[in-house]
Amino acid sequence: MKYFTEQYYKACLASAIDGALQDDVRAAKSEQAYKDQIWSQSFRAFLEQLDLSGAEETTPAVVQAKEQFRALVSSYVEQLQELLPDNIRKNVADWELLAMNHASPALCRQIRRFCASNRRQMQRISRAYESYYKKACVHFKLDMISQIGFHDCLITEIVPQLGDLFFAFAAAPAHSYITAMRCVKCDVIKDDGLKAGATWLYEEVYLVEDKYELQVLVQLPNGAISDFVLQAQRFEFRGSIT
């Protein structure tokens, strides 16, 4: 892929780190009592999102929510440690506080500059692809190609049949009217990420001789980022695979 690579995907994730970030002087150092206080506040907010704010702590739903919240914080800590550069990581006093969007003012300034840089990178890449697509699409059948947009959609099935390749998707708000795509007279060029259970992230479309080439970035069920490439004569869309 030339535009929407794994680096682009990571830039997208990194660009959002400062979305709910709060300047907090007390987050400049790690204090267990203060972290417990922020943890309690954040967990209450999480329960409100689940409509469990009035439930007893011992109810199964709240116990499950607590486990889920801990897992979310732990997962976000891992993501932050992967995305943030060394010059920012070394200034993090408490990773769990940061994962709950509390950081010292100095650290917040660093992170906001980093996020802004990633947003600019995303914009440059998006504009470059848009420029390519604007020129290329004069040769595309737009009524067909414009329907390919399965961003963040789960691929539930991949079925080869008589030279074609079928994809089934879980319904999603952005494209709930399409739950299946048929790639007619399909050749698989690269199959690394061609896995049922993967999440479709981004695609690039090209015309190679008399076929459309679809390059797709996916997230595999284990969280790894991969891609696949296929060429097809045309694409057909419908509500389900039959």
Regions found by a protein language model. Give the residues of each.
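Surface-exposed, interaction-prone regions used to assemble/regulate multi-protein complexes
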Residues: M1-T242
